Curated annotation (Swiss-Prot):
This is Methionine import ATP-binding protein MetN. Keywords: Amino-acid transport, ATP-binding, Cell membrane, Membrane, Nucleotide-binding, Translocase, Transport. It catalyses: L-methionine(out) + ATP + H2O = L-methionine(in) + ADP + phosphate + H(+); D-methionine(out) + ATP + H2O = D-methionine(in) + ADP + phosphate + H(+). It is a peripheral membrane protein. The complex is composed of two ATP-binding proteins (MetN), two transmembrane proteins (MetI) and a solute-binding protein (MetQ). The lineage of its organism: Bacteria, Bacillati, Actinomycetota, Actinomycetes, Bifidobacteriales. CDD domains: ABC_MetN_methionine_transporter. GO terms for cellular component: plasma membrane. InterPro entries: AAA+_ATPase, ABC_transporter-like_ATP-bd, ABC_transporter-like_CS, ACT-like_dom_sf, MetN_ABC, MetN_ABC_transporter-like, NIL_domain, P-loop_NTPase. Part of the ABC transporter complex MetNIQ involved in methionine import. Responsible for energy coupling to the transport system. Its EC number is 7.4.2.11. It is an enzyme of class 7 (translocase). The keyword Nucleotide-binding applies.
Length: 401
C-alpha cells in the first residue's frame, strides 16, 4: 500500500520574464505527481525542463501559482514561514556545487544545521562524529573544503544534510560535477542513506544513468510537464515519449552511438536496426502490458525469410533485472523486412536506422518517430521497395526534397 510523503496536485508555477515586453513564463505546467515514503524517486529532464523549480516547491523556496503541494501530510502551499519551519527541518538538501563554508572545517560544516537549531554542544559533537564515520571522512574532520576532492566535498554535503535526521533528502544535480567513478561512489552512499535510515530521496538530474543506478521510480519532465513516469525498469524497457527515448539512449551501453551507426552503414548494405531486449513483462504507459522481448526474434526471422547479422550489443542491469540492446543488419525484400519489423515492434522497442542508401537521421530513429503501421497506411509503395526505409526516413527524405 502506498504511503505518499510528497504530492503535487495540478501544480503550476509561473514567473514574469525581465526586460521590455515582459511575459509570463510557465516553468511548471499542471504537474500531478506522488512520491511515496521510502522511495528513491528520480526527476529527469534537460536544462529548462522545470525540474529544479519543481524541487524548490517541495521545501517552499518557491510557491505555486496554482495547485497544491502536500509534504509530510501538510498542504504547504500557503503556509507562513513560521509554520513552514518544522517541515523544512525534516527536509535535507544537497547541491551540485556542494555549498560548503570555505572558512569552516569539515566538522564545522556538518555541525552548522545543529547550531542553527540550538542543539546542545555534546549532542552536536556526537552527531558530527557519527556522520563523519558514516560518510567515511573521520580522518578529515579538521580539514577545510579546499583540501578535499569533489567526491569528499559531496560526502560532507550529504553528512550536513543528514545532521537534523530529515525524512526527505532533496538531491539537485548532486553528481553533475563529479567524474563517473566518484558519481558511482556518491550514489552508493545515497542508496545506503535510503536503506539504513529509510529516508525518501528525490533525485533531480539530467543524467539517466544516475536514475538507472539507484532510483525505484522516475518522472521525465519536458517544457514544465511530466511527460512520462513510472517504475524505472518499465520506463527503461518500454519508453513511450521521444524525450524519454533520447535519455534512455544515453544510458544503455548496448545502443550504438551515432558515429558507430555511420560506420555500420558504410560496412553493411542492409537495414540497420537496434532492438531493445526486455527480460520481464512491463506495464506500458497506455495501460497495456508489454511482454518480455527478444525471445521471438529468431522465430520471426524464419517466418518472414529475413536474413540477419548480429553487429553490436550489450546488457545493462536496472533494479537487478537485465535490459539490453542488440543491433542487427536485416536483409530481404522490402515488404518482408517491413512486416517482420512491424510484428517485432508489437512487443519490442525497435530503433530503425534505415539503410546506407536511405538512412534515418540518428535523432529521429532514437526518438522513435518511426511507426510501421502508419508507414503501411500512408506509403502504398513500401511493399514494392527492395529496402524500404522506416516511416521516419521516408518523412525525413520528403521533408528535405
Amino acid at each position: 500500500m502506498s504511503d505518499p510523503i510528497i504530492t503535487f496536485d495540478h501544480v503550476v508555477k509561473e514567473f514574469k520574464t525581465r526586460g521590455r515586453g515582459a511575459n509570463i513564463a510557465r516553468a511548471v505546467d499542471d504537474v500531478s505527481l506522488t512520491i511515496d515514503r521510502g522511495d528513491i524517486f528520480g526527476i529527469i529532464g534537460y536544462s529548462g525542463a522545470g525540474k529544479s523549480t519543481l524541487v524548490r516547491l517541495i521545501n517552499a523556496l518557491e510557491r505555486p501559482t496554482s495547485g497544491t503541494v502536500t509534504v509530510l501530510g501538510t498542504d504547504i502551499t500557503s503556509l507562513s514561514e513560521t509554520k513552514l519551519r518544522p517541515i523544512r527541518q525534516k527536509i535535507g538538501m544537497i547541491f551540485q556545487q556542494f555549498n560548503l563554508f570555505s572558512t569552516k572545517t569539515v566538522a564545522q560544516n556538518i555541525a552548522y544545521p545543529l547550531q542553527l537549531d540550538h542543539w546542545r554542544k555534546d549532542y552536536q559533537d556526537r552527531r558530527v562524529n557519527e556522520l563523519l564515520e558514516f560518510v567515511g571522512l573521520s580522518e578529515h574532520a579538521n580539514k577545510y573544503p579546499s583540501q578535499l576532492s569533489g567526491g569528499q566535498k559531496q560526502r560532507v554535503g550529504i553528512a550536513r544534510a543528514l545532521a537534523t535526521n530529515p525524512e526527505i533528502l532533496l538531491a539537485d544535480e548532486a553528481t553533475s560535477a563529479l567524474d563517473p567513478e566518484t558519481t558511482t561512489e556518491v550514489l552508493a552512499l545515497l542508496k545506503r542513506v535510503n536503506e539504513e535510515f529509510g529516508i525518501t530521496i528525490v533525485l533531480i538530474t539530467h543524467q539517466m544513468n544516475v536514475v538507472q543506478q539507484i532510483a525505484g521510480r522516475v518522472a521525465v519532465m519536458s517544457a514544465g510537464r511530466v511527460v512520462e513516469s513510472g517504475d524505472v525498469y518499465d520506463v527503461f524497457a518500454a519508453p513511450q515519449q521521444p524525450v524519454t527515448k533520447r535519455f534512455i539512449a544515453t544510458a544503455l551501453s548496448g545502443l550504438p552511438e551515432e558515429d558507430r551507426v555511420e560506420r555500420l552503414h558504410h560496412e553493411w548494405s542492409g537495414r540497420i536496426v537496434t532492438v531493445l531486449i526486455r527480460q520481464k513483462d512491463v506495464s506500458g504507459t497506455q495501460g497495456h502490458e508489454l511482454k518480455a522481448s527478444g525471445q521471438n526474434i529468431s522465430e520471426l526471422i524464419a517466418k518472414y525469410g529475413v536474413e540477419s547479422s548480429l553487429l553490436y550489443g550489450g546488457i545493462d542491469t536496472v533494479k537487478g533485472t537485465a535490459i539490453g540492446a542488440i543491433t542487427y543488419e536485416f536483409n530481404g525484400p522490402g515488404w518482408h523486412v517491413d512486416e517482420f519489423l512491424r510484428e517485432l515492434a508489437a512487443n519490442s522497442d525497435v530503433i530503425d536506422f534505415g539503410t546506407a542508401a536511405k538512412p534515418v537521421a540518428y535523432a529521429d530513429a532514437v526518438a522513435g518517430h518511426a511507426s510501421y503501421a502508419e508507414d503501411r497506411a500512408h506509403d502504398p509503395l513500401a511493399a514494392d521497395t527492395a529496402t524500404a526505409p522506416a516511416a521516419s526516413a521516408a518523412a525525413h527524405e520528403g521533408a528535405n526534397a
